[in-house]
UniProtKB/Swiss-Prot annotation:
It comes from Anaplasma marginale (strain St. Maries). This is Type III pantothenate kinase. It is found in: Cytoplasm. GO terms for molecular function: ATP binding; metal ion binding; pantothenate kinase activity. It is an enzyme of class 2 (transferase). One of its GO terms (cellular component) is cytoplasm. ATP binds at D6, V7, G8, N9, T10, S11, T12, K13, T135. It holds the Pfam family Pan_kinase. It catalyses: (R)-pantothenate + ATP = (R)-4'-phosphopantothenate + ADP + H(+). Belongs to the type III pantothenate kinase family.
């Protein structure tokens, strides 16, 4: 069994995978002060809900991280409690799958590498627009030959929520929920609707503009923690909340045989 870990700025996704299939998955907050022992305690409690000894079958781990301060704690987690050395995903892993980063600054986050590996594996002959709705919303343009030739980076929905919370004194705290209508008669409902429809309009607007500028016919793939809320966005051809995890597992299997 493989443990795939996706450390994002806001949350950390952990998945147990066997033979390429996700057996179980959890999401915890990302915290730079969480120790290896605390990680192990947390994972043990979550895993025990499925099986008391499920972690005994762990034979490898791969990590995608965009939060460097967390890396040493997660590495210690696997070395100390599982006696394995985890694979940390880097840009060099893109080469193993025939991907080329054709950007002015040819360095991207490990999560984006995993996204592109999985997307290219699933749709090998398509020109792709891969949207990751994380703390930042990243639009990746990948041609059918495996070249990442363009990108757009915009705020994620959690950034919008945080900004409203931090920059306004009287507005209530809220979570983003799917809203059927945009015009509401209460402050709380209006805030929820504004966040939902505002973010959705941003994603649809950027996607529409990318498609307008592109000379290619793009297959649009969406992933990320909040993608389920926005499954009804226009232009999205495929939604896969596990795309990053799939890419992490594929990279592990490629590097470890």
């Amino acid at each position: 069994m493989i443990v795939a870990v996706d450390v994002g700025n806001t949350s950390t996704k952990i998945a147990l995978c066997e033979n390429g299939t996700v057996v179980d998955k959890w999401r915890i907050s990302t915290c730079g002060k969480r120790t290896a022992a605390e990680y192990f305690s947390c994972i043990s409690v979550l895993a025990s809900r499925r099986s008391a000894d499920i972690l005994a079958g762990v034979r490898g781990a791969a990590i995608s991280s965009v939060v460097p301060v967390v890396n040493r704690h997660v590495e210690e987690l696997f070395e100390r409690f599982f006696n394995i050395s985890p694979v940390f995903i880097t840009n060099s892993h893109a080469d193993l799958f025939g991907l080329k980063i054709c950007l002015a600054q040819p360095t991207i986050g490990a999560d984006r590498v995993a996204d592109l590996v999985a997307a290219k594996t699933l749709w090998p002959t398509s020109d792709l627009l891969v949207i990751d709705m994380g703390t930042a919303t990243v639009f990746n343009l990948l041609d059918r030959n495996g070249g990442l030739y363009g990108q757009v980076v915009a705020p994620g929905v959690s950034c919008l929520v945080h900004s409203m919370r931090e920059c306004t004194a009287l507005l209530p705290q809220t979570l983003v929920r799917e809203s059927e209508k945009i015009v509401c008669d209460s402050t709380a409902a209006s805030l929820e609707a504004g966040l939902y429809w505002g973010y959705r309009a941003m994603v649809e607007g950027i996607t529409k503009q990318i498609m307008r500028e592109s000379t290619r016919t793009l297959r649009v793939i969406a992933t990320g923690g909040g993608v389920g809320l926005f499954r009804n966005c226009d232009y999205l051809n495929h939604i896969d909340e596990l795309l990053t995890i799939k890419g992490i597992v594929q990279i592990y299997e490629k590097t470890q045989g």
